Every structure is written in C-alpha cells, then in structure tokens.
Amino acid sequence: MGWYHVNRIGKGIFLGNVDEVHYNEDFIAKHTPTKDEALELKQRDIRDDELEGYETWPLYKKWMVITQDAWSFHREVNDARCCADESSQIYSDALHYIFEKCYGYPLNSFFSTHDYDGNAMIFCDVLWPPKKHNEALAAMTEEKLQTQLREFLVEVTDDSKYASFPLRVCEDYIKE
C-alpha cells in the first residue's frame, strides 16, 4: 500500500484512454531521434553499446530508449517485439519530445505520459522562470498553447477530434 503524490502538474490536453489513442507512425518517424540524439537523451541505465543496430529497430523500440525505464527496455532487448503491443503507451510518453521539436520549445519544458487510470496527456511542465530565455516560451499564452497542442495532436494522431479538445489541468502522480 502506498500514497499517491502529484509529481508534475501543468496545463495541457487529455487525449483519452491510452489504449484507444492511435498514432500516425509516419509523422512520429519523421521526428524520431537519430542514434546520436538517442545516445544523449537515453535513460541512464541503458548502456551506449545497447544501441547497436539502432537504425534498423522498429519505431516503438527507438522511442523506448528515451521514454521507458531500463527494465522495460531490457525486456524488449531480451524478448524481441514483446513490447510491440505497447506502442500506444510508448508514443504517449514520447509526445512531448516531438511537440517540443516541432514548436521550438526547450527540451523537457513539456511532459507527456499516461496515468494509473490509463489517461494519456501532454502538458506544459516548465519551471518559471526558465534557466535560459526561449522565445517560444516567452511568447506562450494559454490560447497559443491550446492552438498548438490541438494542431499537433490532430497531426500526430491523424484524428480531427483533437481540434476541439480543451486545455485542462493535467497531473502526473507517483505512488510511494
């Protein structure tokens, strides 16, 4: 038994149940980190030599390097394609990397995840004031954020229903 604590909080958009969100893999593939980028962004418990053959990996596995914990990554390495059916969850966790790249925001100024109830979400997670000035962050308003997130979600999911989703307070919980 444990307690749930708010780990991160910010304004963003809920996409719905993570297992019911379908992603446009062609769009995601265009923004997938190169091997060199993955080496910079990877989780600390993943060794550099474990990225051998990165260029030939399936799309979801490339995103596992930076979005999943080492245990999940090693499970995939030891049992090839065992995580293929979890691609929606993996892509939900990768949304903020793609969004930041598309709109010029600094790395880790947004956060995307799915919570214990399976709700996928992406939200602004920047601490104010940011350490370095960034024009995109400086010009952000709630209206602009909502417009950008809606445009992005329509493109990354290829589903126009996200064009009308409202901004909400999103919270990522941890269980301790």
Residue positions per predicted region:
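Acidic (Asp/Glu-rich) sequence patches and key acidic residues
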Residues: 1-147, 151-159, 174-176
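Short helix-terminating capping/connector loops at secondary-structure junctions
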Residues: 160-164
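Glycine-rich, aromatic-bearing surface loops/beta-hairpins
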Residues: 167-170
